[in-house]
Amino acid sequence: MKYQQGTIGRVFMAKIEHGEDLLAELKSLAVKENIRAGIMFILGAVGSASLVTGPRDCSVPPEPVWRRFTDGREILGTGTVFWDETEPVLHIHSTVGKGDLSLTGCLREQTETYLVVEAVILEISGIDASRALDPVLGVKALML
């Protein structure tokens, strides 16, 4: 295990509106406000999204299992933002549900907001963290 100690810096409250791309808006906010490290919490609803719901098996590098929906679902998620060499990289795990059906996984690609998504972002100050491709794991991993 590797770790660093930091403090909570700025706090952002964002409202992502109907039809907006949730991931693109969060990434844009990280660029605009230069959020280099942060924790985020999201809740609301999304009309469509793609999620990686786990690896096909426990191999390294993992083979992702993709799920996509377009029927509008509630969303509750948490994630982080750290930069790679050029831009912020979001890592958000969420549960989306409708009726008795739910999916849990890592949000990827375009995620269209339905009605509204509220996001709270807590900036982490005083740490030196980034994301970079881990050649062994085959994923962009947290680097401390």
Please provide the spans of the model-predicted regions.
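N-terminal intrinsically disordered, cationic/polar leader segments
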Residues: 1-90, 95-144
